Amino acid sequence: MKQKITDYLDEIYGGTFTATHLQKLVTRLESAKRLITQRRKKHWDESDVVLITYADQFHSNDLKPLPTFNQFYHQWLQSIFSHVHLLPFYPWSSDDGFSVIDYHQVASEAGEWQDIQQLGECSHLMFDFVCNHMSAKSEWFKNYLQQHPGFEDFFIAVDPQTDLSAVTRPRALPLLTPFQMRDHSTRHLWTTFSDDQIDLNYRSPEVLLAMVDVLLCYLAKGAEYVRLDAVGFMWKEPGTSCIHLEKTHLIIKLLRSIIDNVAPGTVIITETNVPHKDNIAYFGAGDDEAHMVYQFSLPPLVLHAVQKQNVEALCAWAQNLTLPSSNTTWFNFLASHDGIGLNPLRGLLPESEILELVEALQQEGALVNWKNNPDGTRSPYEINVTYMDALSRRESSDEERCARFILAHAILLSFPGVPAIYIQSILGSRNDYAGVEKLGYNRAINRKKYHSKEITRELNDEATLRHAVYHELSRLITLRRSHNEFHPDNNFTIDTINSSVMRIPRSNADGNCLTGLFNVSKNIQHVNITNLHGRDLISEVDILGNEITLRPWQVMWIK
């Protein structure tokens, strides 16, 4: 393993990663091995379902947000989820946590490490490794601006005359931001995402050592899943797209080797919101990069299927899903703290259909974020909306909203891989326009924070949409977790019965089969399927004949 680490370092750095740097790294890894005593789960299974949430999601009058979350989780969520993905809980200055001031601390206004440790006693933990950039308010960046020894090349200074037209831009913002140094010179620094998020310079061995320290800290604090945020942008080469470069993949291989060495069983998940073929490249050879990749094409394809009442595009894509090894799987989701990405649709749907979907959602109140293209044009890259409101129309009844929403999540839970559900989804949340107006950015539409008493009251009120969604979705998750056919590694096929109905059989090594039927239309569907007998686990109705009737937006799990 140590030889593998050394080989990757040589490929990335050549002679610039010196024997002194290597000794520092080895010392840190040996120290981390002694500190990391918690045993990881050996392999994922059907019981693994992840909750995605902010650490400050709930507040109360007498406790800080993290202990308040722990109380809420214990009462409402612990029996449903196996893992909690706590979005960045470190001190931050912008982007709701993704502009990190200090990687090693918990934001004091949210709580402390002890609160996270307590959560880890009743749940597996997933942390964000915000590896591409850090806050302009951080000590590291202040030291850089002050030209302190050891920080000379922590960030990336570029001559503004450099031709950077080939660089992939995820935002409609300037790539370079000018900053004044202590000696009054001006440096133009690489800022992929915003002028408050300064890209780290991985050409510097000191940056690599500092970020490995961060990773080892998270492993010692109990992270069993580690999300590599915006990882595709880590290595920069002017004159190229600066995304998915070979040395980015080599750094991931290096981090994988380090994790396998000090905390075997830890799962690396890469976050690359890009077209599907680029996304799956982060599996590497199947045993040397990510254990899981975010299934970014799933949210917009499920949305497209329900909006169009047509499953053909979703099925055509899913029929080609292949994994490089049994050591890899998908990290499936429908909603997250970000919007619904459109880039993962490109290559799967014609651009005209993507724009048609965007326009339809805009008419229903969704907000759209745009990116600049190298040719000077701009394209929509993200729809900002709760998944609840994305699936339904303004005039829809709550009963219809709930049915469409549960249908979509049944598809999610039926797919191979580990499913993740965003806190706003399990809470049945609608668009938060007041939050957008107050905070001034589109993504706030799906990031509302709650007083714990307020949300508890709504969940207890049987007349509310929240109550219906929480209980129906909880029941669905519980069913999935108790049936081995849904194991991420088990056999998966998908086909269309007609343009509005699809079938997903899942079978295990014992030969047991569970078949999902999904009607994505507003119409009753009568389908003829031979030799499909058993009991629908959801409605608890026996299926005896060949003709099966599906109500609008109905799902069956037949076993």
UniProtKB/Swiss-Prot annotation:
Give the enzyme's EC designation: 2.4.1.352
Q: Which reaction does it catalyse?
A: (2R)-2-O-(alpha-D-glucopyranosyl)-glycerate + phosphate = (R)-glycerate + alpha-D-glucose 1-phosphate
Q: When the coding gene is removed by deletion, what phenotypic consequences does the entry describe?
A: No visible phenotype when grown on glucose.
| Key words of the record | Carbohydrate metabolism, Glycosyltransferase, Transferase
Kindly give the InterPro entries that the UniProt entry links to this protein: GGa_phosphorylase, Glyco_hydro_13_cat_dom, Glycoside_hydrolase_SF, O16G_dom_2, Sucrose_GGa_phosphorylase-rel
Pfam families in UniProt? Alpha-amylase
Q: What superkingdom does the record give?
A: Bacteria
> Which SMART domains does the entry mention?
Aamy (SM00642)
Q: Name a biological process GO annotation.
A: carbohydrate metabolic process
Instruction: Cite the active-site annotation.
Output: 229
Q: Which GO terms describe its molecular function?
A: glucosylglycerate phosphorylase activity
What Gene3D superfamilies does this protein's entry cite? Glycosidases (3.20.20.80), Oligo-1,6-glucosidase, Domain 2 (3.90.400.10)
Q: What family is this protein classified in?
A: Belongs to the glycosyl hydrolase 13 family. Glucosylglycerate phosphorylase subfamily.
Query: What is known about what this protein does?
Result: Catalyzes the reversible phosphorolysis of glucosylglycerate into alpha-D-glucose 1-phosphate (Glc1P) and D-glycerate (also called (R)-glycerate). May be a regulator of intracellular levels of glucosylglycerate, a compatible solute that primarily protects organisms facing salt stress and very specific nutritional constraints. Cannot catalyze the phosphorolysis of sucrose. Does not act on other sugars such as alpha-D-galactose 1-phosphate, alpha-D-mannose 1-phosphate or beta-D-glucose 1-phosphate; in vitro D-erythronate can substitute for D-glycerate with a much lower efficiency.
Protein name (record): Glucosylglycerate phosphorylase
